[in-house]
Amino acid sequence: MNDRARDLQGRTNDGGMPAQGASAVGNRLHVCVGYSCNNNCVFCMEDDREARYARLRAQTPEDVRRMMTLDPDAREVMFTSGEPTLHPHLADYMRMARDLGFPTVGLITNGRRLAYKPYARELLEAGLNHVLVSIHGPNGKIHDMLTRSRGAFVQAVAGLANLAALRNEFPDLKVHTSYVVNALNVGYLREFFDAMRPLHVDQHVFNVMMPDGRGGADMDHLMARYRDVAAAFQAFVAGLDGDGRAKVFLLDIPYCTTTALPDPVRGYVERYFHYEPDGSTTFRQDAGAADGAIDADLLQASAIDGETVTYSKVAKGAHDAAMRVKRPECAACGFDDLCRGVFRQYVERWGWDEFVPVRPADPVP
């Protein structure tokens, strides 16, 4: 077994909340390859499509190889950004990742191109073994409205059905869905779960929308209040049996708002990192620490010399440090060490009333 195949650290299997582990960066590498997208989601964080296109069109296969070889602790690679299945070299990149020894070769996708079974098979044969399909409603009316793409739901479901059919040949395949929870779909959690039952999905990940990109620009219309999301998810989970509860997970919501939920269904967004050209980070780097700096462990300039571009190494925590805030009262919360804070835009709009520090658990005698 090579070094990349070591067990992931910082996970619990005892029914408690998953822990984040010690690393500020994590062991999941996101490789951004999708310079275009065939959906047009109303809440998309990548709202500057022209800049994304220019940035990723300049990225070469050799650049991608260097990204996947720089950090020896990376044991999971996820191809993402835009719609990666539209990239002509995606299968080649997956073969490259497999040959480099990554035990998990993953894909974050809208699932539409997986509706073509020969293409889905090609990716699986290239080494793909973890697929995260973004699907945001129980039917075409809701999903297609949010993606602003007619027929997107039908194709995404067909893609999931193809993956289900191929699992006999590729038994290591794990399939998850990603449902971006917002004000327009928060009321359809159970309907979505029931609609997905025939597709043999391993886990349904419900990510609360970030008030960033298009979501931030149309926040009053799209952003569901955290308290309403927590209440809706609590009602949803209460109606599931044990097997159903084991398949659902709510992410990207402050811990203090979800104390009524069972611990195993709430957690954190897994730490990961990616590379992008120096100076092209899309978040406000001056919005975080008082001195405007972001810790060097989270944002390392000139980490890779590409063939024509020099790349920075950017951890998910850099975005959090720039976009999220805490108040002094947070230091008294039992979740302070785990919590990344609340989006600045959210508290500027609605204040701090929802966020009540949780008393740390009393020590066991």
Predicted regions and their residues:
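Flexible mid-to-C-terminal extensions adjoining Fe-S/redox cofactors in radical SAM and related proteins
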Residues: 2-25, 278-365
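Short Fe-S-cluster ligation motifs
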Residues: 66-85, 303, 355-365
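Canonical Radical SAM [4Fe-4S] cluster-binding loop centered on the CxxxCxxC motif
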Residues: 21-60
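Radical SAM/AdoMet-radical enzyme domain recognition
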Residues: 61-79, 87-209
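Secreted/processed peptides and extracellular or luminal domains of membrane proteins
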Residues: 43, 47-50, 262, 336-339, ...
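Cysteine-centered iron-sulfur cluster-binding motifs in ferredoxin-type domains/subunits
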Residues: 33-40, 83, 325-330, 336-337
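Short, solvent-exposed loop/turn segments at secondary-structure boundaries
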Residues: 54-57, 144-147, 220
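Radical SAM enzyme [4Fe-4S]-AdoMet core and its adjacent flexible, acidic
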Residues: 141, 149-157, 161, 165-309
